[in-house]
Amino acid sequence: MEIDDVESLNRFISEAGETPAIIFKHSNTCGISARVYREISQVTRPVGIITVQRARDVSDEIARRFEIQHETPQALIVCGDKVLWSASHYAVKAQAVEEALESVSRGQ
């Protein structure tokens, strides 16, 4: 799901309810982001995708709301207004996201 404004970010998180949600931020001008985008597309759960060039305000809102440094590419697992897991650059791998999601889901 493309997240292109703060309203769609709020809706994506709200619709997840108590289920952890995956957010992926990327740059459409970065080679690392392109590789990681292909990797994240293998994740079996829905992913909220933010293209920073088109939605910088959303990226800024994520940094503010979750008190996390802005990076691209960056994957987050959130629940409500809490970050349960995050990774950036080459650490963003489909398997790592799936394993983190399983781990945080067990811990709830």
Q: What feature does the model see in each segment?
A:
Residues M1-G17, R106-Q108:
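N-terminal leader/targeting and pre-domain segments
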Residues F66-C79:
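Structural micro-motif
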Residues R11-V43:
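Local sequence-structure signature of Cys/Sec-based thiol-disulfide redox active-site neighborhoods
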Residues C79-Q108:
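Non-catalytic, surface beta->alpha helical segment in thiol-disulfide oxidoreductase systems
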Residues K25, R45-E61:
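Thiol-based oxidoreductase modules, predominantly thioredoxin-like and allied folds used
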Residues L9, A34-R38, L84-V92:
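A structural signal for the main folded, soluble domain(s) of proteins
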Residues I32-S33, S59, A94:
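Short, well-ordered alpha-helical microsegments
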